[in-house]
């Protein structure tokens, strides 16, 4: 028979698992955490929408057979410029 502490721990873990599985584990908690870590801006993965259309279109990775997907992001160190670089397609 489980103790009260064991049941409470089990329920907490179950709720945590359900909360993270609802949206693939990348919900608002992660984005809020990364915003806090990077001075209020979202992390690199979430920065692409903030880059201008011209910057996104100027990025060309067709010359690279492996890293042929373009990722545009803001530098978390605080640079105001949007930087684009080539990555593996699954990292995009």
UniProtKB/Swiss-Prot annotation:
Keyword Ribonucleoprotein among record annotations: no
Compartment(s): Secreted
GO molecular function, one term: toxin activity
Residues cleaved off as propeptide: 25-44
Predominant cellular place of this UniProt entry's protein: secreted
Cellular component terms per the entry's GO annotation: extracellular region
Expressed in which tissues: Expressed by the venom duct.
TM helices/strands, residue ranges: none
Modification after translation (UniProt): Contains 4 disulfide bonds.
Leader sequence residues: 1-24
Keyword annotations from UniProtKB, A to Z: Disulfide bond, Ion channel impairing toxin, Neurotoxin, Secreted, Signal, Toxin
Domain notes for this protein: The cysteine framework is XXII (C-C-C-C-C-C-C-C).
Function, in words: Probable neurotoxin with unknown target. Possibly targets ion channels.
Protein name: Conotoxin Cal22f
Gene source species: Californiconus californicus
Lineage: Eukaryota, Metazoa, Spiralia, Lophotrochozoa, Mollusca
